[in-house]
Amino acid sequence: MPLEMDQKVNKLTFGCQRSSTSDDDSGCAMEEYTWVPPGLRLEQVQLYFACLPEEKIPYVNSVGEKYRIKQLLYQLPPHDNEVRYCQSLSEEEKKELQMFSAQRKKEALGRGNIKMLSRAVMHATCEKCGEKINGGEVAIFVSRAGPGVCWHPSCFVCSTCNELLVDLIYFYQDGKIHCGRHHAELLKPRCSACDEIIFADECTEAEGRHWHMNHFCCYECETVLGGQRYIMKDGRPFCCGCFESHYAEYCESCGEHIGVDHAQMTYDGQHWHATETCFSCAQCKVSLLGCPFLPKKGRIYCCKACSLGEDVHASDSSDSAFQSARSRESRRSVRMGKSSRSADQCRQSLLLSPAVNYKFPGMFGNADDTLSRKMDDLSMSRQGAGFDNDTWKARDEQETAEDHEEWAEHDDYMTQLLLKFGEKGLFQQPPEDNRSNDHWMSENIKGKNDLQRNNRNQSLASKKYQSDMYWAQSQDGLGDSAYGSHPGPASSRKLQELDMDHGASGYMHEKMPWYKRSLECLSNNLKPQNENICDSMDSLALSNITGASVDAESKSRPSLFSYQNFQELNTRDFDKMSNMGTLNSSMLNRSTESLKSLNSEICQEKPPPEEKPMHTSALKRSKSQTRPQVKFSDDVIDNGDYSSIEIRRPPMSERSRRRVYNSEEQSQRPHHHHHHRRRKSRKSRSENALHLATDSKSSGKERKRSYTAEDYERLFHNKSAHEVQAYIQNADLFGQYSNAASNVGLPSQVVDKFLGLYGEDEDSWCSTCSSSSSDSEEEGYFLGQPIPKPRPQRYQYFSDDLCSPTNALSSSQFSQRTSKSKKKKGHKGKNCIIS
């Protein structure tokens, strides 16, 4: 035999000897492996290990060797089989452990057999993966599963942990193979603390695992947690104290520990207390609990503006005190169809333009418009009775010491207006030569002060109107209760001064005849008189702010207008103002007579006495005007007793018919000289401005008297020079009346027809005593012209001083308004209230 052949045989023989198995359980027949499957030849061993991952092959001094040792301890724990490895078993438990181990070995323990499939085998399938095992390949068979069941070497794993069964040792249970650990757990619970099988009757179960009763304790301090609060961390129980000291998070907002008793918010590794204070916007501190947020540079924000560092609460408005109220009113204005012009734009454009009339931006005080000025003063009238100047003079002396520019030092817009146009600006009489320097207050306002100073009985509404007329309009005409609780300083002063004026005596006039006055006073006083045409609008807004009704019984309200601006107002301005003031405020505030007529069966008012003194307190007269839905702050509240009066707001279906209802009621009841007499409703106030009529006030005991020139001379003959001073500011109203009446020359029949649109009964409107007169109705002559008698059942309009009908409108303009007024009889025009 050749030498080479001998070497090959010797090599093969040597290899077979190394591959032979020994009788011990080591299974390490080959030197290069720490363990080899028993009973296999070398080529079969090499084929088997070739099917396993390289890191799991148990080479000597390799990673596979360490892996095998680890798996032996894990899959085949010694304390599951041997009592000597257990720590704290009772005698009974030890016996039970021995029985348990013997039963498992007998019923489930086995070792897999490695076989090379014959090439004739064509249909072998892996039990794990279900793939086909071809002939000539190595497969593992399990005797407890049956002869035909086999696995790939890499698929022979525990059904629970999917780890390779170490040394091919398995436990068969219910058609599946398991490692020793998980097979034992199928039969008995294992303690998560000591890793031993629990043979006791009681155990603790938590988080899906089990413990011996005395083994369920804190992982750090070993405090028994049975029945106590605990926190699981990485599969280990901790008491609350140990958990907070080792694992508690810090709040990103306050920097404190987030205790186990506090809920926390976690985002991107950051933690916050789940409170409105901590989990809030880093800029504006708005709570973000339950809200989306914007994370930026480790901080959270509520919006993009805050993340950029902007102050979302900053206001660029000059009256930030009314921001919330204006927002409520703006939402209301969308429904009411109000002008979309902002309040800031309105105030800035009006205050910074002295030539523009504040109340009506569309009306300008043009000095060249002589016809407009004459028409304005023809509508303007005065009354011969009013307050004494002593009360106002004492108050003016106290306030003149105030700095003239004090209003400019205040940032708040309302404070500026009240300082500039309050009592100081409205009631103080500056010298004639200084009028040209007062650009902030029009001379029309000063004329209005003279007119209101002549009232014999100042009421709550009239006193508040004097100091607050800019206050009402500065809210952009908002005639709603959004500002009803504004505690303005001017309004509080007026309420405190109510009872100071009710006993004042009337004016005495100079003996100088009215027709001897120069025309210079006329030019000084005629400047912007046209603004008062919108007083009915402002009174509606003001009544909601101050809570007092500003009606014809409360103060003199002359409606001044210019002939050229009337059509512009009729087509444009009143469409805006009526929606804004009249419609809104009329629904909120009802006149006394309307409430009485609509609620005659429900609200029984105590009838006032037949004759009231001329100095009756304004608060007593305003009791019927009190509306419970308007709320006031403490500094403007009147502590009078109003509990005896019950007022119910009528339903909407009754509101639009209140004048017709009143007309029927007035026609049925006798005409008494009531002090609490019928008032003009807010609706008539709006139409008064629309129809170019003035709220002329007659004196308390006179009604439809006619006067001649001799009567006026006798009137002024009895007046003192000091008390006629009020008429100086208005420059010969009587002369204006005479001239304009003769120049314009309106037909008296048209006047009666126009004035008749407003009358439902024979009661006239009185500004002072508020009583209807039944004195003589004889015919008279005014400057040689006969005064026509009015039709019955109609109101007659009188000037404040002359107490004679005002016939001061052009016939063309008047006939145009008369035709429009006929269509609007019943108050269904576009500027009327539509419920």
UniProtKB/Swiss-Prot annotation:
Q: What is this protein called?
A: Prickle-like protein 1-A
Record's compositionally biased regions (Basic residues): 669-683, 819-835
Keywords, A to Z, come to:
Cell membrane, Developmental protein, Gastrulation, LIM domain, Lipoprotein, Membrane, Metal-binding, Methylation, Prenylation, Repeat, Zinc
Q: Which organism is it from?
A: Xenopus laevis (African clawed frog)
Give the chief site where it resides.
membrane
Q: Where in the cell is it found?
A: Cell membrane
Q: State which residues form the propeptide.
A: 833-835
Lipid-conjugated positions (S-farnesyl cysteine) = C832
- Where does the record place the modification Cysteine methyl ester? C832
Question: Which gene underlies this protein?
Answer: prickle1-a
**Basic and acidic residues bias (residue ranges):** 432-453, 603-614, 646-655
* Chain segments carrying region Disordered: 312-346, 426-455, 603-706, 769-835
A GO MF term: zinc ion binding
